Regions:
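ABC ATPase nucleotide-binding domains
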Residues: 90-247
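Conserved ABC transporter NBD signature motif
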Residues: 76-84
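The feature captures the beta-strand-to-loop junction immediately N-terminal to the Walker
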Residues: 53-55
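Conserved coupling/switch loops of ABC nucleotide-binding domains, chiefly the family-specific signature
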Residues: 74-77, 127, 227, 365
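Helix-to-loop junction immediately C-terminal to a conserved catalytic motif
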Residues: 68
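ATPase nucleotide-binding modules
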Residues: 244-296, 306-318, 333-350
Length: 377
């Protein structure tokens, strides 16, 4: 593994300040009446790693910038540790921020880049040296302090940007898509390093990304946004297994959840070509919600569709594309006129044109309202 801080012993840990945040009915409306963030409500506990995730234009970065003080809050209240921050300037909010672009000074050494903000605050040189050396040790940058950014790799430059934030010893760390400029392999490494950094600093972090994999692998809780509105807040496992609506179900998870439109008919979910028996617990919830004989959307994840040797009770499927990813196949298949993605182990070989048998694990299925797209529970 490239140099990093994953192996630094616990003796280098340094607990920073506490910070609890409360966002109450936050709104952002621009002069042209574009409503970017709508009634955003969230309580963030001290030491949480919160990830805002959603597609471009969902309001996640705007919300982060309002927390930082870089965007004015149109309505609502931002409270940090019991103090309203709406009118507090950015420099006085005790917040450190890491941006997508590293924004390093090319003519300065790594040490001077990390120390620059502290020098502007007129921190004592001895304190600056202590903080920079501490951060450099954590981030695996001790051997690079005299180099300039042009002599560093992309991952090393991102670490310098992280180090510049760490030395401020702020109560809250904000990160706005910090890994977007890195290649795929380096993103995986840096994900692990940032998670480890959170454990070492033991402080509050808020991270923005459009990448659901980053959200799932790093967050204590995920905040999923669409069109400026929070869709769901929860732990990664919760939002994956219990999505609040079809948007969350389709956004979280790769490949996305499969959806089939149909109706509830007695004990079955039915379409023109499919008839699937619903487990008792799920059926009880569907009936209690009043969906008997009504249109619904059936959802099932690719890994919950089983490929089996034909036994007569399997559902016939025809493979249109077979993608081998190494340990598994992603099979794009047609099932009764419905296009589905199936995750299958690479024990067997698959190819386009194959006729296969599948079964749905109905204990893992989801149902959604056909109009509102809200989960039926």
């Amino acid at each position: 593994m490239p140099d990093g801080f994953l192996g630094i012993p616990n003796g280098n840990d340094k607990e920073l300040k506490m910070a609890q945040l409360s966002l109450k009915h936050i709104q952002k409306i621009y002069d042209n009446q574009v409503h970017v963030v709508k009634d955003f409500n969230l309580e963030i506990e001290d030491k949480e790693f919160i990830v805002f995730v959603g597609p471009s234009g969902c309001g996640k970065s705007t919300t982060l910038r309002m927390i930082a003080g870089l965007e004015e809050i149109s309505a609502g209240e931002l409270v940090i540790d019991g103090v309203c921050m709406n009118d507090v300037p950015a420099k006085s909010r005790d917040i450190a921020m890491v941006f997508q672009n590293y924004a390093l000074y090319p003519h300065m050494t790594v040490y001077d880049n990390m120390a620059f903000g502290l020098k502007m605050q007129k921190i004592a040189p001895a304190v600056i040296e202590e903080r920079v050396n501490w951060a450099a040790q954590i981030l695996g940058l001790r051997d690079y302090l005299t180099r300039k950014p042009g002599a560093l790799s992309g991952g090393q430059r991102q670490r310098v940007a992280l180090g510049r934030a760490i030395v401020r010893e702020a109560g809250v760390f904000l990160m706005d898509e910090p890994l977007s400029n890195l290649d795929a392999k380096l993103r995986v490494q840096m994900r692990a390093e940032i998670s480890k950094l959170h454990q070492k600093l033991n402080t509050t972090m808020i991270y923005v990304t459009h990448d659901q994999t980053e959200a799932m692998t790093m967050a204590t809780r995920i905040v999923i946004l669409k069109d400026g509105v929070i869709q769901q807040v929860g732990a990664p496992k919760q939002v994956y297994n219990e999505p609040a609506n079809m948007f969350v179900a389709g956004f979280i998870g790769s490949p996305a959840m499969n959806f089939i439109r149909g109706a509830i008919d007695d004990r079955y979910f039915v379409t023109e070509t499919l008839r699937l028996e619903i487990p008792e617990d799920t059926l009880a919830a569907v009936n209690a919600a009043g969906y008997q004989r009504k249109a619904v959307v059936f959802g099932i994840r690719p890994e919950d569709i089983l490929t089996l040797q034909s036994r007569g009770d399997d559902i016939a499927a025809k493979v249109s594309v077979a993608e081998l990813t190494g340990a598994e196949f992603m099979l794009y298949a047609t099932v009764g006129g419905h296009e589905l993605v199936v995750r299958a182990g690479a024990v067997n070989d698959y190819a386009a044109g194959d006729n296969i048998g599948i079964q749905f694990d109905m204990n893992k299925c989801h149902f959604f309202d056909a109009d509102t797209e809200v989960a039926i529970r």
